[in-house]
Amino acid sequence: SKNPNSRPLLLLHGWPGSISEFLNIIPKLAHPEKFGGKIEDGFDVIVPSLPGFGFSSQINKALGPRKIGKILNKFMIKNLGYKNYFVQGGDWGATIAGWIGLDSSKYCKGIHINCLPLRHPKGPKNSKEKKWEKKFNFDQITQEGYRTQQATKPQTLSYAMIDSPVGTAAWILEKFHGWSDLKMGKIEKTFSKDELLSNIMIYIITKSFNTASWIYFGRRKEGGRSFPKNFKKIKVPTAIAIFPKEMLEWPPKSYVNRIFNIKRWRKFPNGGHFAALEEPDILVSDILSFFNKDLKNI
């Protein structure tokens, strides 16, 4: 950013995404003045490949999202030298952002998420929350296949994919098709071929399909979706961006509010799981508004 007072913003992708998801929004967050905004709203934008994904160094064991959160906090503070930072993410990025908020609130000053894979250890409390959980569990029956495979026997799948570009493409594209708000029901009306292929090729050329899938195994080792039993509400100011075709349906606000210190809650008319690609301008606008206006004095 050309903003002399710019603040660092850590953007975190998930699976089966990559850093390529953010290519359309990085310039708008770093240089809003080039898109009709103000130079003083620009961020230093940091977009790492998660450990085991893409262009990050190879890992030799499964790492869960909590461990990755600690690694990334060290990366921001020790390696890059920032005193504090904001974080944004969807999918695994949202999970990691939550753990960063819990473990590193001294340094993380704001969270923006567009997905909620995390769960409160005490579960739902009221009838509305219980109804959501019942529906969520039913809806996930048809989604659990890939997740169970990657969380229990990821290497078996990896041997099939490591030398099969078509297999890798099929495994990934099925998610982009099923988790997105497709215009006219067609994937290429929502994503360009370049966007889809760039993401797939990152997995192929870096030979990271196997290690990227280990994060599911790592989460199982860390205890699963839920925070620990001694969990205390995350104090970091948090923005929630809800897109209607998100494959992980959002719980009621009352449930989310027991996890996060919600300062912004927005529901948008269009978009799905891959918000940075599907609705980049909406996502950018919400990020800029939250961090630069709602958290102006932080």
Predicted features by range, described:
Residues S6-G14:
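Short beta-strand element of the alpha/beta-hydrolase
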Residues W15-P27:
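The serine-hydrolase catalytic nucleophile loop
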Residues P16, P51-G54, L118, G272:
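Alpha/beta-hydrolase active-site loop signature
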Residues K28, P32-F35, N79-E133:
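Conserved hydrolase catalytic core segment
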Residues L29-G42, R225-K229:
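Short mixed-charge
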Residues G37, I46, L50-L63, G98:
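Glycine-rich "HGGG/HGxG" loop immediately N-terminal to the catalytic nucleophile
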Residues N60-N79:
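Alpha/beta-hydrolase active-site loop
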Residues Q150-I298:
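C-terminal subdomain of alpha/beta-hydrolase-fold enzymes, centered on the catalytic histidine
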